[in-house]
Amino acid sequence: MASPGEEVTSDESGEESNAMNLMEFSDEILLHILRYTPVSDLVLNVRRVCRKLSVLSLDKSLTHAVTLHKDYQVDKDKVKQLMREIGKEIQELNMSGCYWLPGSTIDQVTRCRNLVKLNLSGCNLTSLRLSKMLSALQHLRSLAIDVNPGFDASHLSSECKATLSRVLELKQTLYTPSYGVVPCCTSLEKLLLYFEILDRSREGLIISGQLMVGESNVPHYQNLRVFYARLAPGPVNQEVVRLYLAVLSDRTPEKLHAFLISAPGGFPQSCAVKNLLDSMARNVTLDALQLPGSWMNGSSLLQRLKFSNPVYFSFSRCSLSGSQLVQRVLNGGKDLRSLVSLNLSGCVHCLSPDSTLRKAEDEIDSSIAETLVASCCHLRHLNLSCAHHHSSEDLGRHLCQLLAHLKCLLSLALPVCSIADVSPVPADKPSVQPATNATSPSFGKKVRIGVQTYPRNCLEQGNSRPQPSVFWTLLESLPFLQQLELIGSSFSSAMPRNEPAIRNSLPPCGRAQHVGDAEVAAIGQLAFLQSLTLAQLPNILTGSGLVHIGAQCQHLRTLSLANLGMMGKVMYMPALVDMLKHCRCLRDLRLEQPYFNANAQFFQALSHCSSLQRLCIISRSGSLQPDAVMAFMTACLEVIMCHMFTGESLTVCKTLQQSLIKSFQASRPALNVVIFPLLHEDLTEVIRDVPMMHLDEITLFKSRVAEEPPNLWG
């Protein structure tokens, strides 16, 4: 702007006249923009900007569905104000994972009398509080809750039971042996059950899976269309789920089209379950199936079940041979365009014709992979992890080359050994591997401390494409991939579920030694990548590929790195530090690496990740610098979860944990801090107090691609 007395040039005046105020946009455009703003911000902040935004912020198209899930800055006062302002307008409310809100705040949901869909998973909820709430929500049709110790269905009022009788969709997470509210939901069409019951109470008492079964406690499954059960490890969870299934086996619902049970380890099949599966084979047609491996191994069930336009299959950890996959699942190679998601994790024989004679180091039958790709051409989610899938040297028959035809893939999980390019390199062509990777993996290359060992101009080099490997070609063919997992076939996390930390790990597959920094750099092609997992890549020497990913994958939100390079040294630390400086959108970071030194340099680089919300470090014999952690938490205002399990002493861990809580709890209501020695005998007791949302999504390692059907719970 010109000051008084100055002439305004024509260029300046024209620039001002062409400038457009945001408020000059049409209401339709502004509403579209406001859809990307959390409703809590719209109601509590944006509407106060001006009169126009005050009206638009309360538009029913914006306020009918409210999500507080992962809105970590919302506190009890904001929730109360939000419910007072727009409670009557809300039809869908998602408060899942709001573990920090007190029960009195959850009571405010009663103001939303027009609610149709309510998600309170992970919230503080008693049977009395639930009864009072549901009594006021007569229009409710979809409900998600937790059932905690002390839950008593006899506390539910008749008005509450009347509401439950109209509920069509129920998601129930069980922390105690109970039917919960299932017997009251007489019109259920979709039932999702998550069994998280521990075998022992806090006092050390053994928990029994027996339930008081009476006439009024029997679930009603006659209208059921979708049944899903996910079990945490432990015999009690198996015992309780059998009671749910026993009722289902008496009369199989005619409309059942999705039957899914996810159970780790061995899960013996009972007589009731066998009767249920036999009944399903006779009476229902499915479009989604997942069963424990022990129920399918050696069974003719797949041959007898009927499918119609299937959208999801999970045969995780089944001894399914390639011949069975082609004949029984892929219907002899016929069109399966309807299939959206396929989980073959842990199916070690699924790409080989015969499972009886195959050894881990044997090569796959590429014709089976070719049939899979041709039949399921619209696959969006594919998991082939936890197995050895070794390709032959035949030209054009590598697994990566075949998977490149799945142009619709959004998420992909592969074992590290499956992407190894073992074809001989002609003498006139340069090797794909960097020169540093030529070092024998058995001997560590000496590294000068404080000196970068990866090329300083690696980002410039990234613009000049190297001789393409089969993995490079695969990713080049999947430009819209959003989630990628490369997991060593013998990798196991040092922190398993409900057990002491694992002190030793299995050696990586020999073929994984062919996968190094160049293959990791290829991931930088994925411009839309949001989630990346790299686990057990022994030939990562400098980590130069990580820098390329950080610079190129600007949408990366979740990063999990585990056991990269040699176990005795963290040689990729300089590259990791440079990578983190580029990760502006990163929200979740999980690092699992023995001897990892979480020092000031690391945390200073991590401070560049301004969007970071959750951090988990797991390091056997690792160390940390408390002052650096405090400085990092001060700089990164969005961080609400800090989990560190290292080799530090209990005294150091407790002192740091208390300091973090004291300094930041008041300003960050959702703050969850756990600093604890990894190999301490009380680790499992500490873990049980971690909110399930954090434990399941980041602290515990697992493959997440095709873990559940897409949109299982909207």
Description of each model-found segment:
Residues 27, 42-60:
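Short helix-loop-helix/strand-helix junction enriched in hydrophobic and basic residues
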Residues 13-16, 25-29, 40, 59:
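Intracellular innate-immune signaling modules
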